[in-house]
């Protein structure tokens, strides 16, 4: 019987995403200096991070600010008026964002147990450490982090970026401007401001007297410029959006 055959079919087009797919890239954090900032490589992402906002954050944290900035200092008093707060560099703030993006997938999606374990390890590494690599057993990577799972993971990070771009800049219209997540021992708040995204991490302590959880005064925070994430986001492709998503002259950052 004559049978259908694909003997002489042309090779399928190879997309950019399938070239040099390195599953181990999720376990490496490569940071290199660049003109005016840094280049960070993680997963299949390459982020170009300018040293934007650092000087302004330090000015806001000082006592020598113009009157127009006082409202911003008052709104974020736990950051700018708190002697126990620490400003971190933009690439560390980005690292926290990526950790939260992975944690968001871990908490919200029905992942198979082995894959969930890898996502958990990666998110904890990004959130709690500053090392350039994490060792994950090659057997685990080979079994649970397949190329398809890798693509799902990266797509989930992009979806989280898209969610961030639905936020409005801090405003007085009651429109949502922050994403908050509570993890074991810490609370992370991501807030959209004029310059990008303000990332803050506050430790959660337990009161010895009553066992209740309270937010510690100790907090680290940093700023990720909007352009860093926009090139990896699928939002705002020409459609008009509410202007409160873009600018609020009442805040300094």
Swiss-Prot record:
It is found in: Virion membrane; Host cell membrane; Host endomembrane system. GO terms for biological process: viral process. Keywords: Host cell membrane, Host membrane, Membrane, Viral matrix protein, Virion. Pfam families: Filo_VP24. One of its GO terms (molecular function) is structural constituent of virion. The keyword Membrane applies. It comes from the Viruses. One of its GO terms (cellular component) is viral nucleocapsid. It is a peripheral membrane protein. May act as a minor matrix protein that plays a role in assembly of viral nucleocapsid and virion budding. Unlike Ebola VP24, mVP24 has no measurable impact of host dendritic cell function. Monomer or homotetramer (Potential). Interacts with nucleoprotein. Belongs to the filoviridae membrane-associated protein VP24 family. This is Membrane-associated protein VP24. It comes from Lake Victoria marburgvirus (strain Musoke-80).
């Amino acid at each position: 019987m004559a049978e259908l055959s694909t003997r002489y079919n042309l090779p399928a087009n190879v997309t950019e995403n399938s070239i040099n797919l390195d599953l181990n890239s999720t376990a490496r954090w490569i940071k290199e200096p660049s003109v005016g900032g840094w280049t960070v490589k993680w997963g299949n992402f390459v982020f170009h991070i300018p040293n934007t906002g650092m000087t302004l954050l330090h000015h806001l944290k000082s006592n020598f600010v113009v009157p127009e900035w006082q409202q911003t200092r008052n709104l974020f008093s736990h950051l700018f008026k708190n002697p126990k707060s620490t400003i971190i560099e933009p690439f560390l703030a980005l690292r926290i964002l990526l950790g939260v993006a992975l944690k968001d997938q871990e908490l919200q999606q029905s992942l198979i147990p082995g894959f969930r374990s890898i996502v958990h390890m990666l998110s904890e590494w990004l959130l709690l450490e500053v090392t350039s690599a994490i060792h994950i057993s090659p057997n685990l990577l080979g079994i649970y982090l397949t190329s398809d799972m890798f693509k799902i993971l990266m797509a989930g990070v992009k979806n989280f970026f898209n969610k961030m771009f639905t936020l409005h800049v801090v405003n007085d219209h009651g429109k949502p401007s922050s994403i908050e997540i509570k993890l074991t021992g810490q609370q992370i708040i991501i807030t959209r401001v004029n310059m990008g995204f303000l990332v803050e991490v506050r430790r959660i302590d337990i009161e010895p007297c009553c066992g209740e959880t309270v937010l510690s005064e100790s907090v680290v925070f940093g700023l990720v410029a909007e352009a860093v994430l926009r090139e990896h986001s699928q939002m705002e492709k020409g459609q008009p959006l509410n202007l409160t998503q873009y600018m609020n002259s009442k805040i300094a950052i």
